Amino acid sequence: MSHEKSVTEFTRDLVGVYINAGVVKSYAKDTKGNTRLYELSNKEIMDIGIEIHSICETDEKEYIDIDYCTEADLKIIRLANTISLLNQLHVAGRVCELPIKTLVHGTSLRGIIDRIIWNKDKKEIEVIDIKSHYIPFILDDPELKGMPQSKRLGYSFQLHVYVEMLDWLFTASPDALRDSFIGSIYNKDEPIHPIICSKLEIPKTITANNLFDILLKERSVFTDVKYTVLIMHIDQNYFKSEYKTGKASVVYESIKCNREWFKKMVFFDLAELERKKSLAEIHKKAAMAKKREEKKKIKQELKKSAKGKK
């Protein structure tokens, strides 16, 4: 890979402790060069956190804007997006910002997983959540002993819920998964909206069931996987200064596989489907011909038997 230091490696260097339970403050120099203490509003903290998340989400994707009219259209778009992201995880070994909606222990859950790393040799998935704080870190506390117990438990719970959600996506029965992704679409065997087909550059005959079959094929890679979890604790001040001064690169090489891969996969699956249908027809005709031949032989034997009795 062409990057100087991966996001995971970079943020592992910053793992530390959330130690301040009071008002978040930031030190900055005023116009005269004097250091002053400023209180940050919740909006400022959130805006900077969003910026850091966007920096960490540096895998380039070819996003396609698609207008939709109905809930069924939205379900199709989400299904197509999930297929593309799972393929990127499979091929590139990592994916960012995976939207996920699953059923865990009878409860419907939604979330966006910040980063997932796939090690195909070990069949291991690392689920990562980015936590950005505007507070200096103590870098010699890898076990996070200084973090309040409630924070540690909350973060741990969140990550383990993400693991449960991801595992459900990979292991749920096809019927349960179908119900989650396209259950409310009235006719799953009718072609999807032509505008969606045009945007994705796929045949206008593609159906919701065709897309769902591709999802099943793509998720079949992730069977019997082991899970690990990681929280990326990022000090906002330190991260921004490192990023802006170029001390550490956090930019991955480009990955633009979504639309091109999706188009090829759909065409391949349709061709495979047609081939299987053709083979099924051939086998069906052969079986019918065999039955006709057997019936003909039985009739001939019955005639011979009747003549012998006379």
UniProtKB/Swiss-Prot annotation:
Example GO BP: interstrand cross-link repair
Ranges of Basic and acidic residues composition bias in the record: 290-304
GO terms for MF: single-stranded DNA 5'-3' DNA exonuclease activity
Secretion signal span: none
Cited Pfam families: Exo5 (PF09810)
Superkingdom, taxonomy of origin: Viruses
Region (Disordered): 290-310
Residue ranges the record marks as coiled coil: 269-307
InterPro entries on file: EXOV
Keywords attached to this entry: Coiled coil
Protein known as: Uncharacterized protein ORF95
Organism of origin: Ostreid herpesvirus 1 (isolate France) (OsHV-1)
